[in-house]
């Protein structure tokens, strides 16, 4: 697989961004927390990672030019977006033709404490909801699957969704 330009949308401190940077051509990590962007940038310098850049930004208004990336990746980020369908549309915008999106997020659940504990705006999404977001933005070859089930309460499940521009 050729080295890709990857956008990690909702990157947090960038643990996954740093892992992807080991094989990617370039990774752009986006987060709306100035603290996370500063922390991630410091880790990048400390570890000498020169193909990873952190930027402050919102999932619904990504500071990346249109058609610039090969892969848009959102891991446990979509449930923090005020308008998740707009976040998916932004991922579409920044992708090159033929680019792909990969979303890992919580399946719909009823663990209300997540709103207070983790600032979750949404209590996950069904596979059908995520599929609608992707198809509504224009993605094709959309696939979804439950890829993880917690064995302890609150028994959260993780959905993987992919699509192609």
Q: Language-model features: where?
A:
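Class I SAM-dependent methyltransferase SAM/SAH-binding core
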Residues: 5-8, 12-61
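A short acidic, Gly/Pro-enriched loop at the edge of an enzyme's catalytic core
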Residues: 60-71
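A short SAM/SAH-binding and catalytic strip from SAM-dependent methyltransferases
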Residues: 70-83
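Short N-terminal helix/helix-N-cap motif within the alpha/beta-hydrolase-1
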Residues: 82-86, 111
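A short glycine-rich, Lys/Arg-flanked "PGG" loop and its adjoining helix->strand segment in the class I
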Residues: 85-100
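C-terminal alpha-helical "lid/dimerization" subdomain adjacent to the S-adenosyl-L-methionine
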Residues: 100-157, 162
